[in-house]
Amino acid sequence: MFMGEYNHIIDAKGRIIVPSKFRDSLGEHFVVTVGLDGCLFVYPNEEWQHFVEQLKNLPGNKEARQLQRYFMAGAADCEVDKQGRILIPGNLRQHAGLDKDIVFVGVLSKIEIWSKERWESNSYDNMDEIADHMSEFGLSF
């Protein structure tokens, strides 16, 4: 399970150091794809295969095909180099607006990669709103 928030910098070649707490759980090879809300999703291979199976089992309608294209066209196989970095392809950097400061966010079975600016604008500052969402989904402490 992935959790936590880690700030890093992306270099001029599009490489980012993966937080050490995430490296073991990611494994040697994993998938980076377009995410929702302007971020990237990073899946360990096992989780990615599970997600792909769900995409395969969608009906053949237009909406399902759009979802399949969205996630599969943006997907890239990645691996961590000897310095603990991953190379984010240009199209994915552009999708997420990654240019310098980035944030890794652990979200259960996947990792999200955000530009720091987008992350800060999407973060919840309103605790009442969070409490309302928790109640709406039946969550309690």
From Swiss-Prot:
The record's family statement is:
Belongs to the MraZ family.
Concerning CDD domains, the annotation shows: MraZ_C, MraZ_N
| Alphabetical list of Pfam families matching this protein | MraZ
The molecular function terms in GO held by this entry are:
DNA-binding transcription factor activity; transcription cis-regulatory region binding
**Quick one: signal sequence residues?**
none
Q: Where is the SpoVT-AbrB domain?
A: 5-47, 75-118
Partners and quaternary state? Answer: Forms oligomers.
This protein's name: Transcriptional regulator MraZ
What are the entry keywords? Cytoplasm, DNA-binding, Repeat, Transcription, Transcription regulation
Q: Which organism is it from?
A: Lachnoclostridium phytofermentans (strain ATCC 700394 / DSM 18823 / ISDg) (Clostridium phytofermentans)
What are the subcellular locations of this protein?
Cytoplasm, Nucleoid
Q: Per its UniProt record, what PROSITE patterns does this chain match?
A: SPOVT_ABRB (PS51740)
Per the record, the GO terms for biological process are:
negative regulation of DNA-templated transcription initiation
